[in-house]
């Protein structure tokens, strides 16, 4: 059974929907598909905005990321927001009409990792736009009701879509143990580095140093809260003695320099996707008793993201530098090549 009423008025849901699909490496194609229906415990969301992530661009250009290979047509996009259009059995029909930010994960709630609260590590995870699971560059998607997070009317759909990369920043800052007075080094001033910079400041860091080889990106980092920016080719990164280092670049040199930059008993967090294997300065890690960990997506971060944005502690709207229609998704996937680009967003549905 699917409820399809809003405030007592019938909602006409289309039988078919649009999707912009990656049909082969470097080629997107608009197709028409049957509209999905929410299962028990799920909601149907009318997509309004989808942020373009570096992983989307990587699948578009390369057809794979590590073990995840695109072997059949795939709908990209996992940073999404919209409005609930229908609900499945077991979901309060009063949720229909709610504006939501989508946490694009479908874990198995019975797995040991999910039961431990680490559902992001669930081995049976179905994650949007990770082969073979389709993403959100389409008119409608279904998601577990608990993963469609209500957003305040003051939050734009574009900002709500970017709760996803913001959640990566939150998870990174949590792993780094950032608190009031922390000194933090962040390598990489791309979208993840920028949201992590904002989160670090919101968590109380008094010094946030952002390292990037691109001058324009360093300027962006300053705009979004970095206290200092450095060019790693021209500055001595290793002598910084910070409390925590977060790598959002994936660059081998940045990781090695960053590890050297951490004071004894400090923390190293690896977020950026780089080489599968890199040489590590093991004596530095051992002798300083550094804690080195990774971040894989996020868990239980959406309420924090909503609170930070609603309070004005994090600015997501200003990160959007380019907007495209669903039909222009292919252009959106290469927008990161535009000088000054921070984040491209695909507007699937206009208005509210």
Task: Cite the ranges covered by each PLM segment.
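Mid-domain Rossmann-like dinucleotide-binding core that forms the NAD(H)/NADP(H) cofactor-binding site
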Residues: 155-234
């Amino acid at each position: 059974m699917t409820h399809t009423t809003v405030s007592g008025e019938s909602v006409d849901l289309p039988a078919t929907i649009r999707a912009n699909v990656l049909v082969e490496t470097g080629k997107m194609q608009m197709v028409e598909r049957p509209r999905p229906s929410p299962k028990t415990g799920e909601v149907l969301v009318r997509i309004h905005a989808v942020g373009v992530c570096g992983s989307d661009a990587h699948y578009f250009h390369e057809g794979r990321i590590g073990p995840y290979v695109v072997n059949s047509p795939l709908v990209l996009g996992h940073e999404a927001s919209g409005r609930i259009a229908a609900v499945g059995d077991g979901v309060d029909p009063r949720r229909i009409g709610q504006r939501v930010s989508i946490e694009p994960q479908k874990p198995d709630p019975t797995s040991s990792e999910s039961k431990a609260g680490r559902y992001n590590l669930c081995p049976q995870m179905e994650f949007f736009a990770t082969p073979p699971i389709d993403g959100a560059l389409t008119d409608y998607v279904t998601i577990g009701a608990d993963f469609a997070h209500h957003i305040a009317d003051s939050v734009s759909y574009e900002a709500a879509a970017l709760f996803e990369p913001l959640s990566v920043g939150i998870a990174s800052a949590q792993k780094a143990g950032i608190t009031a007075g922390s000194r933090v080094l962040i390598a990489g001033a791309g979208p993840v580095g920028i949201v992590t910079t904002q989160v670090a400041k919101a968590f109380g860091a008094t010094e946030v140093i952002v390292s990037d080889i691109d001058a324009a990106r360093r300027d962006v980092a300053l705009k979004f809260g970095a206290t200092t920016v450095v060019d790693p080719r021209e500055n001595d990164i290793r002598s910084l003695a910070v409390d925590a280092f977060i790598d959002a670049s994936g660059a081998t040199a940045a990781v090695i320099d960053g590890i050297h930059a951490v004071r004894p008993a400090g923390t190293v967090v690896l977020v950026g996707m780089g080489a599968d294997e890199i040489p590590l300065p093991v004596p530095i890690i051992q002798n300083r008793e550094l804690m080195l960990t990774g971040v894989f997506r996020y868990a239980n971060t959406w309420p924090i993201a909503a609170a930070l944005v609603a309070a004005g502690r994090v600015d997501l709207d200003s990160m959007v530098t380019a907007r495209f229609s669903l039909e222009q998704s292919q252009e959106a996937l290469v927008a990161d090549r535009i000088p000054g680009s921070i984040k491209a967003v695909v507007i699937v549905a206009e208005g509210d």
